[in-house]
A protein has these predicted regions:
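A structure-centric signal for secondary-structure junctions around beta-strands
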Residues: 1-6, 15, 29-30, 81-83, ...
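Conserved amphipathic alpha-helical interaction elements at protein-protein interfaces in regulatory
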Residues: 55-60, 93
Length: 100
């Protein structure tokens, strides 16, 4: 079975609110809620993937030092096995705005 490495992050603002996004219609698992993040490319660290994905998806800049490891998910789907490190981030530069 193919393994897929996806990194995700819980963005927590100063008021303790956590950003979640709803998966759009037409994508697998449409309608479910998820943390921002994405696939880790070959040769890329999970932290580097999150820095890239947060810039692409939300237009914010995050330093690797601001990504704190929090948890880990491992789940077998029919076609692949998901491996997902989850981080927490409480500091970033820019205003969170959806881009995708």
């Amino acid at each position: 079975m193919k393994s897929v490495l996806v990194a995700a992050v819980a963005l927590v603002d100063p008021d303790g609110r956590v950003l979640l996004a709803q998966r759009p219609a037409g994508k697998s698992m449409a309608g479910l809620w998820e943390f921002p993040g994405g696939k880790v490319e070959p040769g890329e660290t999970p932290e580097a993937a999150l820095i890239r994905e947060l810039k692409e998806e939300l237009g914010i800049d995050v330093a690797a030092a601001c990504l704190a490891p929090f948890s880990f998910a491992s789940h077998a789907y029919p076609d692949f096995h998901l491996l997902m490190p989850l981080y927490v981030c409480r500091r970033w530069k820019g205003i969170v705005m959806p881009r995708e």
